[in-house]
């Protein structure tokens, strides 16, 4: 990821790639998943180049962001620090998984700063504990065992099976550059020095109806079954939400199928044709 700014926050310097374009629209702010980093958005950043302002960042513990001291921190406060440092009063948030959770929490805390939300298989603060099917539970147990034994390469491979391929799909369903990039991004996260305790935002699950619009929801039909179901529950609760269930992809459509994902962003009016 090309770094344009290092944004200092308590205990860290956040790596930011901001590419401004004077088109009068709120910048796109792309928030990565918890098994990736800002490079998840390579395709979207390329599509926005020269057409719309766009920003991506590596959160603490990911990518090129520098950890100076393990410090309790809040993701919402870190994002706010980035937007304030770059004098961005209002933005269009696009968040995947944990990045979707951050987008939701930020929008509820700072609704006046948000022009719209695009949530890609989002985690949600305060959501009910999921019930995992046997296949997902077996993978989760194997990941826990690999972590306990310090077998980080095995853990990385298993997490690719869970999040990139889809738990019900064969290992290696996604290969080539997408697989290599997943393993590189998640490998950094698995080996990152401790960033300090994460201070959770207030529960968002009971307040989804209060999200500022417009809200768009995207998910891959090959994702973990309980996450697909959660997306459908979210869709039923948010007034006026627009939905894009994507066939043939799992949890990370921007990585697995960037052209198809960018087509969704164009249909949503976030990218120009």
Ranges and model annotations:
Residues 102-106:
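Hydrolases whose catalytic domains are alpha/beta-hydrolase-1, hotdog thioesterase
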Residues 246-258, 262:
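Catalytic histidine-centered segment of alpha/beta-hydrolase-like enzymes
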Residues 108-109, 115-147:
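Flexible "cap/lid" loop of the alpha/beta hydrolase fold
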Residues 183-236, 245:
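Conserved serine/cysteine hydrolase catalytic core
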Residues 43-46, 55-98, 263-266:
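Active-site loop/oxyanion-hole signature of alpha/beta-hydrolase fold enzymes
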Residues 12-67:
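Conserved HGGG/HGGXW glycine-rich cap/lid loop of the alpha/beta-hydrolase fold
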Residues 149-202, 207:
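Conserved alpha/beta-hydrolase catalytic His-Asp/Glu region
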Residues 1-13:
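N-terminal cap/lid segment of alpha/beta-hydrolase-fold proteins
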């Amino acid at each position: 990821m090309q770094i344009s700014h290092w944004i200092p926050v308590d205990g860290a310097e956040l790596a930011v790639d901001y590419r401004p374009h004077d088109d009068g629209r709120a910048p796109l702010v792309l928030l990565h998943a918890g098994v990736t980093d800002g490079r998840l958005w390579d395709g979207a950043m390329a599509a926005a180049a020269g057409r719309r302002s766009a920003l991506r960042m590596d959160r603490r513990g990911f990518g090129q962001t520098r950890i100076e001291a393990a410090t309790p921190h809040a993701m919402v406060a870190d994002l706010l620090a980035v937007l304030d440092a770059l004098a961005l009063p209002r933005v269009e948030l696009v968040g995947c998984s944990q990045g979707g959770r951050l987008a939701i929490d930020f929008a509820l805390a700072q609704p006046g700063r948000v022009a719209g939300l695009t949530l890609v298989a989002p985690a949600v603060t305060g959501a009910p504990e999921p019930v995992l099917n046997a296949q997902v539970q077996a993978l989760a147990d194997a990941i826990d065992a690999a972590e306990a034994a310090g077998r980080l390469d095995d853990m990385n491979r298993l997490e690719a099976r869970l999040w990139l391929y889809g738990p019900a799909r064969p290992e290696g369903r996604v290969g080539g550059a997408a697989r290599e990039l997943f393993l590189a991004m998640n490998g950094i996260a698995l080996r990152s020095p401790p960033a300090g305790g994460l201070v959770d935002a207030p529960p968002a699950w009971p307040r989804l109806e209060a999200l500022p619009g417009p809200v768009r929801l995207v998910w891959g039909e090959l994702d973990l079954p309980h996450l697909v179901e959660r997306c459908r529950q979210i869709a039923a609760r948010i007034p006026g939400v627009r939905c894009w269930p994507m066939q043939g992809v799992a949890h990370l459509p921007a990585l697995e199928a960037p052209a198809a994902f960018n087509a969704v962003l164009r249909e949503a009016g976030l990218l120009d044709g």
